[in-house]
Each structure stands twice: as C-alpha cells, then as structure tokens.
Amino acid sequence: MVKSAPGYLFCMSQSSSELQNSALEIFSRLNSQQSEAVKETDRPLLIIAGAGSGKTLTVASKIAYLIASGVPPEHILALTFNQKAAEELKVRVTEMLKCPADLNISTFHSFCNQVIHDNILNTKLNANFKVITETAQLVYLAKNINSFGLEHLAFNHKPYTLAEEMKKFISRCKDEFVTPQDLQLYLEEHQKLSLDEEATEDLNNLKDILKIYQAYEAYKLQNNLLDFGDMLCIVHNLLKSKPIVLQSYQEKFQFVIVDEFQDTNYIQLQIVNLIAKKHGHITVVGDDDQSIYRFRGAHLTNIAEFKKTFPNFTEKTLGHNYRSTKKIVATANTLIENSPERTIKQLFTNNPPGNQIEVIETPNDTSQANYIVEITKNLLKTYQPQDIAILCRRRASAEPILNAFRKHALSFNFVGQTGFFQEPIIKDITAFLNILNNPIESNVEIVRILNRPNYGIKQVDIYKFTSYAKQTGLSFYETFDHLNKIAVDKLKFPIVKQTLTDLLNKKNRLRTIDLIHTILFEQEFYKYEVALKNTRNLQLLNQFYTFAEEFNNIYPDSDLEAFTDYLTYASNFEIEEKNDTEQAVIISTIHGVKGMQYPVVIIPDVNDRKIPATYQKDKFAIPKKLLKGIQSTYDDKELHTQEERRLFYVAITRAKEKLVITYANRHGENKTGSKPSRFLQEINYQQNPHIAFQQITSPEILIELTNTENQTKTKLLQQLIVNLTTGQFNDAIETVLLFAKITNKNLNIQTDIIKKIKEPNYTQLEQITTKKPLTVPSDHVFSVSQFVSYQKCPRQYHYRYVMKIPEKPRYYFEFGTTIHNIAEKLTRLQKEKQPVNEIIAEELLAKFWSSKSYQSELDEKRDYAEAKNILKNFLEEQNKSKTEILDIERWFEIAVGNVRIRGRIDRIDRDKTGYTVIDYKTSKTASSLNELKKDMQLLVYALAVKEIYGSTSQLKVGDWFLRPNKQVFFTPEIQAIENIQTEIHVMSKKINSAVFDPKKDAWNCRECDYACLCD
C-alpha cells in the first residue's frame, strides 16, 4: 500500500476528496488485468503487456494513481523509449489528475543529460558539451581512417563501410559498458596464449579496433563532445563512484517506472537498478514478443536480469487487445507461437472479426509497387492518407514503392534512413555552397543553378552558355563575364551572375551557418516552396539547416571549405529523414513505427531474404568474455531469425482494421526467383481461414500511361507559381495555355475576360484566397511562447510553428543563456541547502562558458568580467531574500477553457503572504511595470500557479533583470487575467482556422527573420 507523504497534497487547488475521486475515475477506465497492475505498489512489478493491450493507459494510470494516493510527483521517475511516448504519458497523466503536476517523464538520454547537468561540478565535463550526431561520428571515422595507424584491418579502399562497422562496434561497447581499458586488458591476456589462425586474426583486428576506439574517445574529449552512449556511462559511473549522488537520486526517485523494458540495454538496466534497489518500488513494462532492437544492444535477457535483481517481484500480464480485429489477432498469435523461450501469453480481443487478411503474390517488385499504389488509391476513397501505413523491412524494399508514389503524385511521409543528400533540393543547396567554395571548378554546379526554376532560364539559353564556355576554354563562372558575346536572355543571366558575386562577397564576412541561412532565404528556396505549399521540400530544407547547425555546434570556427568537405563525406551515408506531413500516407521501416497503430497496414516484400533478412555475422564482435549480463543459449543466427519473426509480428500488430501482405516472385534483374517468407508458411497463408490469398499474374500490372502526363502537369503547375511569384505574367499566361492543352481543354482569352480583371473585384479576390480551415488536433498543447509569437504577428507564427522554418542564429543569446543557466543552478543548490558562494559561482561560470560566439578576445574578456559581476550581485540579492525557494524550473500544463497550454516557470518562492513567480531575464535594460502588467507570459504563469497551489492571499509575478540587477513585480488584476484568457481563446480559434495574416509594423517587420518570405 502506498504511504502518503505527511501533510502532502500535490495540487492545492484540489481537495483530498477530489483527488480520491480522480483515483476512482482512473479505475473506471481499466479492465481487471490493468487494475491489478496499477494497484500493485508494494513490490517490484513486471508487466508483460501484449500488443494493443492498453500499455500506455496502464502506465499513465499507475503514475496518476501513485500521485492521487499521496506520492509527490517529484518522487516518481518514468523512463520511456522515445520523446513522443514521454509527451503522450505527460498529457494522459495530467488529464487524469485534472491538475498540472511536475512530472519526471523522459527518455533515458534526456534523463541522463539532466543528471549530468545537475551534477556538472562532480564531473570533468564543461557544461557546454555537445552531443555528437551519428552522421558526425561516421564522418570523423571515415575521414580519419588513414590516420589511426591500422596494421591489420583491411578495408579495401572502402572507408565508409569500415566507418559504419566501427561506429556500430563502439556503440555496442557503450551499451555493454566495455571501455577501451577493458579491451586493452583482454588483448594483454590473450597475447600470451597459443591461438589458432582464426583467433589470431580476430585478436589482431581487435588491436586495430582499439586504436580507432581510443582515437575516437580522444577526439570527443578534445572537442567537448559526448555521444549517447557516453551519457549513460557517465551517469552510471557517477552513481557508482559518488555515494552521496546515488543516495540523493534514490531518495528523490522512490518510485521508478520503465516503459518498453524489452528494448533496454545492459547499461540502462544498471542505472535503473542502482536508483531503484533501495526502495524496491520499481515497475517495468514490456513485451518479449516485441523485442526488436538487438542491433542496438537491447537485451531480451533483461527480463531475466530483472527477476534476478528483484527476486521478490510479482508479474502481471495484459493480454486483452483493444486495437485489432479478431482475424488479425489470431494470425499474430499463430506467428509468434513459433518463438521459443517466450513468456506464454495469448492475445485475445472482443473486437469484431473484421475483413480477411489479404496476402498477394505478384510477378515482380515493379508490379508489386504498382499494385500497392492502386490499392492505396482505392483505400483513399474511404480512409484519410495518414490512416494508411506501408511498412518495409528495409529502405531497399521501400524504394520501388516510393518511386511509384512519386510517379502517381501521391503524397507520402517516409520514416527511416534515406538518401537525404540525393534529394534534388538538397543537391541545389550543395551546388550553391560548392560554387562559393571554388567557383572556377564548379561547372556542373553552375548548370544546376541555372536550371533553378526561380530564374526561369530556358534550356536553349543554357546550352548556348555552356557551348560558348567549351569553345573558349573558359570555366562556366568566367563565362558570366562574356554574356554580351552570347545570344542568351540578357535579363536573367546577369541576375545569376550578380547573385553569385554578392554571395562570394558575403562568404568572406559571414560565418558559415549565417551564409547557409542567407542562401536558403535570399535565393528563394523557402519562398518558392512556401508558394508551392510543398511541405516535403520545406521539411528537407529545415532538416538541412539543422544538419548545418549541428556541424556549427561541433566545429564553430570552421569555414565554408570545411563544411563542404564535411558534406562530401556525409553524403556517403544514409541519415534519418524527419518528415511529419500530416495529410500523407506513411511509408516506413518497421522499426520506425514501433508503438504506433494504423487503421490500414500494408507489408510488402514478405519474401525470404527480405523478411527474415539474410543473416550476416558481425564483422567485428565484442569478445564474449567481456559481455555482461545473462547471455542467451542460442547462437547468433538463430537469435537473428527469432528477432526477424518478432519484427514481422510488430508489423502485423500495428493494423487495426485492414492488413495487406504482399510478396514478389522476382526482384530487379535477378533471374532466380524469390521465395515467399517462411513466416508466411508459419501462418499457413494459403489455407488459413483468416487469410484471403490471391495471385496476380500480369507482370506489368497497373502501369498507367498517364505517368508522363501527371509529371508534366506537376511541372507546369510549379512553373506557373514561379511565373506568378517572380512577376513573369506573360510567361504565366503561356504556362496556363500549355496546361490547358495537355488537359484537352480549349482556352480562349476573350476581351470580356480582360475587361473583367481591369478593375479587380476585391470581394471576389477575398473569396478566392480564403484559406481552407486547418483543424488543430484535439490533443494539441500550445506553449506560452507560441501565443506570444501569434500575438506579435500571425504570419510569423505560421512560418515558425506551422512550417517550422528556422530563425536566424543569434550568438548574443548565448551570454544570456549562460547567465540564466548558472542562476538556475545556484538557486537549486540553495534550495537543497548546499553551500553557495562566489567561488562556486565562478566554478559554474567556467563550466558553462563558451568562447565560440566570440571573434574578439577583448570582447570575450569584457563579457566574462560582466558575467562574474552579475553573478556576484545575484548572490548578494539572494542572500538578502527572506522567501523560501519552493520550486525551480516548474513544469505546468493547464487548460484555459478547451485550450491546453504548457510551459516552465523559472522559479516560485513563498513567504507568509503568498507566492512569488520569478522569471529571470538577461536583457540590458529592465521593462517598466506597465509593460509587465500586459505581459502574456507572466499572466499565464499566474494562472498556472493559482491552479497548482489554489487561491492565495497574495500572488506576485514579475521579472528579475539580472544584468541591471532590478526586480519588477506586481499582483495581477483579475480583469487582466480574464482578458488574457479571452485573448487565448480568440487566438486559438484563429490558429485553428488558419488565420495567419501579417501584422504590419515597421520595426517588427524590419527585425523579422521571415521578412523576405512575406509580401
């Protein structure tokens, strides 16, 4: 039974009886299995949660039940597999409690990142460490392969392949907590032994691998970088080596919940065990049937480890599937029963039987792709695009389908690793950068730029331009100086020349990241795609800019040449594409949709050597002697087959209503046929009463003759938008006539039409341009800053939060961020009754300080001295304070009517009279009292505090301006709060209706990052 904290009430705006009612409501939504799992709080608990069994509901209910029963939210730690799952849990728990709670729900990596920052003085790290991306890891390894002094590893001039293998090996070492020192000791021990030829070769390879591992670790240390594995290892070491730190986390997190436990690795398990062992209040939730991350070091044996660590555990099973039809559930059961050593459970459902599962045999992979396009088109008559998911084992299986979707102009989201750098729009950006880096040797890139649609240059003119260059022996860049000798468009070519000249001039005075931002905006990449409403290309642009920012974070002093070199290496690797267009069919790897569900699922390429994929032994494996934890008794090949079966099971159980499985008898140019997957045999696909099997015999099924026509129409529509946005109205008319001709429409521009548009009918124009309403999802949660942005300018909000177009980098923010972070750390130390003085403040300043934003040593010294003075004044003021520090970085989520808003309050203090909300500011001047009284952020904070703590005798809110050391506070008036609530309702309705008209203001427009997009 949970013991309540004495006198504790986590939400003072609710009475004890209201919280008890919340607890009762929690159980009203649960079945008996779920209720038992939620109520079990006295012993370690293992929940085996079958697919679609309400796992998230159960976990959220358990957290809410603990809080409603009196456990302070800050004593509960919930760890999830990804950020999306963490956010969903937070939303669900908040809704159940009907009150904002400061919930510690995060991914393992986010949790470890926070632990490191909170204990930065106990580490050798600088607080400004950066997390190195997977791409940056691969680039470093590939680029430096010849500098590692390798003597035995043969990579046959394939540094990229070896880089991928090394990255995988090092990552596995981190997962297994195998250090370079461990490998060194292993080598020293085994060099003394008499070994056969194969073992000697493995040992020699390991010597070279150790050199790479050591060099990689030294590189990160030198550049203040961590990878994800480092974060886990550092926290593990911190908890093991610092008993005081371990004790503090054991007392802080007395209840630990781990979601997707089957996908945790050894080091994650050890961190959880260290924190939870003292109190034993641990709940792990998982399903061994859905363990699909063995390649990341996930241990299916972790369940056995849990039982060994917590022998007094109890086990609950959730087997009621709420997601899928009876036929889908029965088929999934039939498949997974072939897995050995699984926890025995049988999924069941009360859902209707549903349609038969369709298994389709096609002659080849081309006809398979076209069949999928055709059934998708038919499904779109009944379902929304985002209701349909096409789940592939690997990217290669998705490629023919992606191409077929492109040909038929069907919108899709791809989730998984992709040839990002081969996307046309990314090639265009890269072309600009290569020209600026070396214009004389960029002939191919210049041709690519001349073909950019926003320049509107005809192919015949490009041909004349390049022909002249070849005849004269000039580079294409030099040829721009001879335009008067070439019969080309004398208006358009000079524009390109001037563009390149301007950018080359800017190259010498702009940072690389600023130059990239200039190219994306001034060369109308964003403007063109915004006009086309091409969400996919907009997301690609956003992702490229993020890629550039990540490079800038790691190498802040690098020039354009270094970045283009980095690009060259990075383009040899596939990277994860970030695509979240809402109205689009999902095409994804199976791994990419773990935890998701869709009304319709299509699984292509269910062939042997596809699903299951062909087993490939790891080229470089960690010696088994160094592996920790319980090891499986099966060999690697059998473990691979078992995981592939679970992967197919995961794909099947994503489907709610309709499941289609396809396979092809032949792939590509292979003359040998492809066999259907052995897993299809396991579900008895030709005789199973739940399955309708169909053979498609026509080898060129459904290849429509309209593909070329569709592509031409799309190109003409794109050209029309270019004509209109660049003011080429005569060309626009020509494009319209061409479009009409292709669609077999007769278009006669008559004089009466011309007369009609001589005097524009603005009412008519308004009707034409009225925006189609965009419904914000019912579970959408706004941030306070989103409303502040909309209040400032709706169009700016649209670009920033809807289209997610990046803002300009602002280096002057870094000083303020540093001061803010240190003030927060000092306040936290004071709250925890730890010693705080100027020496500690200076230690923190040294840890948090970053030199990267300074180009002048003099400027840096000046700001560093100012920072020391600000912190000195802060401590002096803080020491005078008579208030109690109640909360720091207080997370909240509140409802204003039907609008949900979340945010974090820097600090909440309390004294005898009431509560004080403090927001730290680092601007050079303080705002006036009258300005703050209208500040939306502070008024929303007032609403949040009242909801968290209930009505108080007095509530003050305000800003502490740290640079001028001035505090401005006020008591919010009821009318002001009511006004802001009304304004939030009005703004949310406008956002929901896609009202994003610009708010014209000379100063704001001049300072706006998106001014060049806004006409």
Regions found by a protein language model. Give the residues of each.
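A basic/glycine-biased coupling hinge at the interface between accessory DNA-binding modules
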Residues: 8-24, 42-43, 50-53, 64-233, ...
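Accessory/regulatory regions of helicases
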Residues: 12, 24, 583, 600, ...
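Conserved motor-region signature of P-loop NTPase helicases/translocases
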Residues: 3-91, 202, 244, 251, ...
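Metal-dependent nuclease catalytic regions and adjoining charged, substrate-binding loops involved
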Residues: 595, 689-714, 839, 945-1015
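Metal-dependent nuclease catalytic cores in nucleic-acid-processing enzymes
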Residues: 593, 644-659, 821, 827, ...
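Conserved helicase core region in the C-terminal RecA-like lobe
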Residues: 104-114, 257-260, 285, 394-396, ...
